[in-house]
């Protein structure tokens, strides 16, 4: 079991597959190209679902690409050593995934016309999902209990740091024309409507049948059965108890796990940390 994180600029990263030199190069040297598309999220926000939807939009619903190429090759995580080397050598438009907070992301992006989609999810559900997910990997120290992980999460002592700072940082770009903010809860409630919104943002015109195919092949069940998307190909030495990337994918699962005291404590921290945002911006509030 990894005893600790790999810290960089005050942010905890997994102890393997993440290198300080690469993180520095991403921020200072990596050039985001105009034709690139960025998928930005805090971990456990529905990243893989969004990647699957975007990939299917690009193929107009044809599932061949998503069923033959692993998800981390279709849209590599730039902050991993493998992802970074794949991206710097890739020609043409690139799909780029990242969990990096805004202050660690490539400086070149902020003066480019590249489009980015930022996906936000209720942090309470992220906390519960993260607890069950990370506890089954060898990538981080095991909290042992949800109560311990709860405390870590509120303090930002979890992978990729504070959810509150991550979301505050990236949402500062929400008025930019090349930046689309999506909410996991909205995708769950109206998947087809969200797919159309992404198509509009990307300038893609899909017919009704093509939209239905995107919907079909990006469903929870379809992704769960797709070995290119469910992370079943991941190395066994990084997994302890049979990693399940796709556990539930539901909204409000935190209510099954938080105590009343935890729910109240979380509400208090949320109100403090997210003060200043317009009322109603978060669909779960």
From Swiss-Prot:
3'-phosphoadenylyl sulfate binds at residues 44-49, 121, 129, 184, 218, 223, 247-249. The keyword Hydrolase does not apply. Belongs to the sulfotransferase 1 family. SUPFAM superfamilies: P-loop containing nucleoside triphosphate hydrolases. GO terms for biological process: cholesterol metabolic process; steroid metabolic process; sulfation. Sulfotransferase that utilizes 3'-phospho-5'-adenylyl sulfate (PAPS) as sulfonate donor to catalyze the sulfonation of steroids and bile acids in the liver and adrenal glands. Mediates the sulfation of a wide range of steroids and sterols, including pregnenolone, androsterone, DHEA, bile acids, cholesterol and as well many xenobiotics that contain alcohol and phenol functional groups. Sulfonation increases the water solubility of most compounds, and therefore their renal excretion, but it can also result in bioactivation to form active metabolites. The lineage of its organism: Eukaryota, Metazoa, Chordata, Craniata, Vertebrata. Homodimer. GO terms for cellular component: cytoplasm. One of its GO terms (molecular function) is 3'-phosphoadenosine 5'-phosphosulfate binding. The gene is Sult2a1. This is Sulfotransferase 2A1. Keywords: Cytoplasm, Lipid metabolism, Steroid metabolism, Transferase.
């Amino acid at each position: 079991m990894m005893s600790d994180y790999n810290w960089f600029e005050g942010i905890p990263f997994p102890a393997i597959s993440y290198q300080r030199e690469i993180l520095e190069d991403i921020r200072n040297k990596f050039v985001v190209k105009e034709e690139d598309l960025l998928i930005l999220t805090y971990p456990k926000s529905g990243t893989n679902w969004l990647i699957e939807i975007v990939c299917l939009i690009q193929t107009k619903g044809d599932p061949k690409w998503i069923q033959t190429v692993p998800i981390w090759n279709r849209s590599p995580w730039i902050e991993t050593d493998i992802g970074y080397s794949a991206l710097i050598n890739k020609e043409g438009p690139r799909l780029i995934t990242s969990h990096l907070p805004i202050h660690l992301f490539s400086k070149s992006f902020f003066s480019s016309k590249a489009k980015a989609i930022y996906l936000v999810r209720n942090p309470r559900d992220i906390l519960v999902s993260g607890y069950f997910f990370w506890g089954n990997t060898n990538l981080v120290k095991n909290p042992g209990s949800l109560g311990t992980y709860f405390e870590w999460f509120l303090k930002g002592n979890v992978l990729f740091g504070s959810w509150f700072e991550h979301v505050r940082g990236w949402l500062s770009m929400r008025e930019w024309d090349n930046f689309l903010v999506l909410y996991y809860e909205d995708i769950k409630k109206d998947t087809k409507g969200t797919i159309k919104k992404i198509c509009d943002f990307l300038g893609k015109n899909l017919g009704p049948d093509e939209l239905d195919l995107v919907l079909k092949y990006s469903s929870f069940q379809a992704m769960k059965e797709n070995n290119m998307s469910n992370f079943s190909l991941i190395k066994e030495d990084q997994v302890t108890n049979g990693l399940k990337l796709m556990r539930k994918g539901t909204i409000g699962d935190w209510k099954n796990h938080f105590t009343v005291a935890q729910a109240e404590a979380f509400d208090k921290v949320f109100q403090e940390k997210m003060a200043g945002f317009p009322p109603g911006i978060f669909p779960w509030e």
